[in-house]
Amino acid sequence: MTDLTSKERSRLKGIAMNLDPIFQLGKESLTPEFTKAIDEALEKRELIKINVLKNCDGDKNALAETLAERTHAKVVQVIGRKIVLFRYQKDPKKRKIEL
C-alpha cells in the first residue's frame, strides 16, 4: 500500500470521527496477541480506532508507527490518546472504504 495522500487521509479522519475505539492499549503495550487482534480487526473493518490508556509507557506516535508496521497498515491520525489505523481488505470485492 502506498502512502496516503492528504485528501485520502482527510476522508479517513472524517469517517473515523464517528468510530468508537475498539481496542485499548495499556501497560502490556504491543504484545503479539494484541498485534494479531489488531490485524484481524483491520481485515474485517479496514479502519479502526485504538484508545491509548494513561498507564501505557512509550510515545504514542512511535507505538502507532510500530503497530502499523507490524500489521501492514497506515497511520491515519494520532490525536490525544487515540490512534487511527487503516488497511484495505485483501479481497477488492469486500472493501468497504474506497478512496
Predicted region positions:
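Positively charged, polar, low-complexity stretches
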Residues: M1-L99
